[in-house]
Amino acid sequence: MKPTRLTECGNWVLDRFPVTKFWNDHMAHYYAPKNFNFWYFFGSLALLVLVNQIITGILLTMNYKPDAKLAFDSIEYIMRDVPWGWLVRYMHSTGASAFFIVIYLHMFRGIMYGSFKHPRELIWIFGMLLFVALMAEAFMGYLLPWGQMSYWGAQVIISLFSAIPVIGDDLSLWIRGDYVIADATLNRFFAFHVIAVPLVLVMLVFMHLVALHEVGSNNPDGIEIKESKDPWGHPVDGIPFHPYYTVKDIVGVGVFLLFFATVIFYMPEAGGYFLEHANFIPADPMKTPEHIAPVWYFTPFYSILRAIPDKFAGVIGMGGSIVVLFLLPWLDRCPVKSIRYRGGIFKKALLLFVISFIALGYLGTQPVTPIATILARLFTAIYFGFFLLMPIYTRWEKTKPVPRSLTKIHSLEEQFHTLEEQLPALLAEITAVKPLSAEIGHPAFKSSFFSRRPNTEGMINVIGRLAKKAKGSLD
């Protein structure tokens, strides 16, 4: 049969631009571990939020004025007079916080399951560069509404660069473009926020994904699925990413969008955490707010800065809290990747790290008090202790044996068959049968009856086994 003109046109394109090969290599024929769980939603959600930020950012840029005299009014114009402008603005502001939420959860999953360990060190490095670029993008975008908190928050952060010896003052002046935050600062931040940093973000996302698909995805058990393959060369413990995980991610996207829409339509300010109340007031260089604090996703690092008395040492501490994350692949000396098979020391250390990070984030939103400062110093010590002591406690911790392949997943038919075999024995254990004799009419018709009653001891044994099994699955 002669191919149609449309087919010929498609083949002509594919001969010159291998879309099908790209799709097969990175989706249809890319094998991912078959035991992905809830924690593996957040990578795809981060891509979704990035697309949302780019599209809504373009729409906002069409009406925004990067001028110190017009910036605040242009935001009000978008909110009040541009059709659906309020929705676009709230999608962008909520998307910024959502971006950091999914990124923080994505990073936590990487630490928990050892996704930074060999051979995925470069994936982790690209991911951390992405995180730094995202922080720069968020900081520069934070100034654009030109509200009170935007102005003074940027003033505080930029002034930190002046603490650097020798070059500090000149560096701060170069960043601002003026002796104070003014129109020049707003223009250069707008250019970086809209053009330069997004290009870096897209490039780093591409490099992150290429490195990931080269060495393969990690999994909750920390097993390398490429080490065992079937006769066709496919990983025994893997399944094609499409359609299995694309469908799974669609479910995650649906649930995420439900929460995302709820925040946008019912609480876009999130109690002053997503959009600060002070930012609804135009920037006034002559009036300092009573309490200056950055957006919530910067507050853990801001709290570390405030916990250290010396200004330069505080800047070093804040920068070091990010730099130490880059060194994680070489700080962890444990041969086991996943937390499922690691010792109790690492689990407790990770729990303390999470508590310290959340506590630092909360303290960063609160005014400075003596008690808050003491707590911030304590949690700062725990934060750095998790990383700096890692070469010691990870080398000596006791680990569990790691299985050579992923746990076999039985089919539904096999599960029912197993249940049919085990159910009679289970009933016999949790019940006690006692024979009863009864005469019906003539003694020749004497019959035996049985009474089945609960067996307390058997029930306790069954519950104990179930509890041990549940604890083992959680470990």
PLM feature spans:
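Membrane-embedded and interfacial regions of multi-pass energy-transducing membrane proteins
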Residues: 1-98, 102-423, 427, 431, ...
